[in-house]
Amino acid sequence: MTRYFLLLLSLFLSHTMHAQLTFNTFQAYADYAIKNNPDIKRAAINELIERQNYYSSIGAVLPVVRASFNLTDNLIRPTTIVPGTFIGRPDTSLAFQFGRKYLMQPGFDASWNVMNAAGVEQVLIAKKNMEIAKLSASLNEEQLKTILASSYYNYLLTKANLLFVEKNLSVSDSLKRIAATRFRNGLVDELEVNRTKTQHLRNALNLSQSQTLADKALNELKVLANLPTTEKLVITESIAVPQSLEADLAVLNDQSKRTQAKVAAMRVEVAKMNRTKEGLKYLPDVNLFGNYNWQSQSDKFSDQKWFKSSAIGLKIETVIFGGGQKAFAVKRADLNYQSAKIDLDNTLHNISKDNESLRLDYQKSVADISMVAELLQLSERNYTLANYKYSNQILPFDQLLNVYTELLNAQQQYLEKISGYYAVKNKIQAIVNQ
């Protein structure tokens, strides 16, 4: 029994130690990272806070009903001195003690500011702030997704580069062996052998550096997903053939639909509403109030008679002079409104500029990819032909090395253009998903 238990335990521990997270697409990785990102969690909490502020603002304009209970034990009843002329004696005063030892007063009272226009405006402002918080949370998510996409596709590019480097290392190893064979047969001198070895060492060093870059890119993905660096993360997707985004470019024509523009526009509305609210504070407060109370006094706790009292009334209150505070508040709110409008105009201008830049970058990247893909294909074909000629002693090593250098340059250019394409693609798709 113990042996079986230990076997099961070892299998469980082995499974736990080799557990890993695997993602097949960017969307799957992004969903996981967004779900676990602390900034996104804080944005969700801020949204809930604004919702509570909205509910609180509603409560501020509703009637207030209070219940009270007062029990007083008059250890020494207060004495009232009444001066006067008593029994023909002037400058005489009499002392009286009023009340009982115990005084009990339960009751209810209610009040309602029926002309709280500023409070009603604050409800509308709080509702708008709640919408802004929701949009801001979406904006944070979109910005994070852009960062995630940049890091994700950067990792895919490092993996693609590794494939090129591994292939180049295999090629240089083949050249090194061919040169060594020729050297033994007396067909080439030591210089050519050493040059093939040098190229092979360069490729080996490049492989080591490329692997380090890939590891760093993978660690960055772990950090963005809020994973410990010791966690095993596997991305199975590879760089795909670029697809046309012409249908998505239409979204770049209307900058007002961008989340940044929506947030800026809502802030203008809130600033305008704040200005209105400050102006409404000039109106007088009109309060309705009412109360209903019971009172009982006695020298000991007993079933004494209860006396009732109730009242209703209307109270109108306004500030005649308050040091100009209301005027200053209105002016400050108006300046904030003007500032918010400037921010909106600036946001729309920047979005328009960014949209046009994205459009041009996309068109250029598509054209460049078409050319570098053809260049890479030709360079690979040229190297195949040159290697064949070199193997058959038709082409000298210097010319083979030149063709090989052209292939390396074509590979590098291809990766650079693919990287530029995905950078533009991520930004455009982030806008489309808004």
Tell what function each PLM region has:
Residues 28, 52, 137, 141-255, ...:
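Periplasmic alpha-helical coiled-coil/stalk elements that build and connect Gram-negative outer-membrane
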Residues 21, 68-108, 112, 236-245, ...:
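Small/polar, glycine/serine/threonine/aspartate-rich low-complexity segments that form flexible
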Residues 1-30, 34, 419-421, 428-429, ...:
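Bacterial Sec-dependent N-terminal signal peptides
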Residues 205-227, 377-434:
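Short segments within alpha-helical structural elements
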Residues 41-45, 58-59, 101, 114-141, ...:
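Sec/SRP-type N-terminal targeting helices
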Residues 19-70, 76, 225, 229-269, ...:
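Bacterial Sec-pathway N-terminal export signals of envelope proteins
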